[in-house]
Amino acid sequence: GKIAGFQEKPKNPKTIPEKPDKIYASMGIYVFKHPVIEQELHDDARNSKSAHDFGRDIIPQMLKKGLKVCVYNFLDENKREAQYWRDIGAIDAYYEANMDLVQVEPIFNLYDKDWPIRTYQEQFPPAKTVFAGEEIPGRVGLVLDSIIPGGCIISGGKVIRSILSPNVRIDSFTEISDSILMEGVNVARYAKIKRAIIDKDVNIPEGMVIGYDLEEDKKNFFVTESGIVVVAKGTEI
């Protein structure tokens, strides 16, 4: 249906008529016609009083202009079952949502053909693991309970319960566990990483240890409330 009004995180939200204990909540999922959103973003950018936020500024302004803004129910009208949704506005929530994907039967299954993900897929060579511990004991390219895309090379290191982005290089005798590594990350020999998010284009030097001593990690990186270590994009270590 068409939206009559929009409030962003009000202290006393308006309730649903005849349901005083319930409210309609925005899930932050938007679909726009390109010319419309382009114009709205230009208008908002010129507004010095705007916080440049979709919920606080852009959507309410569209309603003031009388534009057609509609809302769609999260529930499946036929099955009456809620589909998958996670609020990933906080780093800890983002981490947990990603870790869900490496479960044996995740709630959100990337391999579900009924819910394909349509996005641009850059072409990379296949991922590969090298070294099987035959020449040097402990030098094993091993991946367990993890997701690794094209362009990745696991060269004698271990990746356990982790998610890698394209073009990640893991060198020998390293161990990556319960972590998220973004595109272009290189991890040198003997490094150990646990419960961390390593952003793009970070080079982890030889012997570096992240996630095992949070007090030490706090001196160099950001650590969330739940103990996830975040290494920012392009950080030089």
Spans of model-derived segments:
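Conserved core of the sugar-phosphate nucleotidyltransferase
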Residues: 1-35, 39
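Left-handed beta-helix
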Residues: 35, 44-237
